[in-house]
Amino acid sequence: MFKRGGIYAVNLAHSETSSQESCPCLVVSNNISNEYSSVVTIIPLSMVNLDRIYDFECFLPAAKSGLGVDAKISSHIIITIDKSSVVGERLGFLNKGLMEQVEKTLRLQLALE
């Protein structure tokens, strides 16, 4: 089962947001939905332009994400995908502190505050 805060490789070949075949993505949908729905909501991770982190982005240090490389999420790219697009096992998992930072960027992007 997919868990909120988990990082998974996702096949985004059919997505308008990516030209690469698979990309590590962070699950942001709630765990009840993740368990019972056929879809999951994700944010793709980027490993480029890490020298500048905007307010709608969140830096994910390798040591705290389990990825082995630094990355960032951009909360303006939120995608709901079919679970069959996920390829392989979980790559990493964000701790509570990092998820709180991600949630802050989501609230900003979605004007929830």
Predicted regions and their residues:
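Short, charged beta-turn/beta-strand-edge "cap" motif at the junction between a beta-strand
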Residues: 13-17
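Compact nucleic-acid interaction/catalytic patches
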Residues: 18-22, 27-63
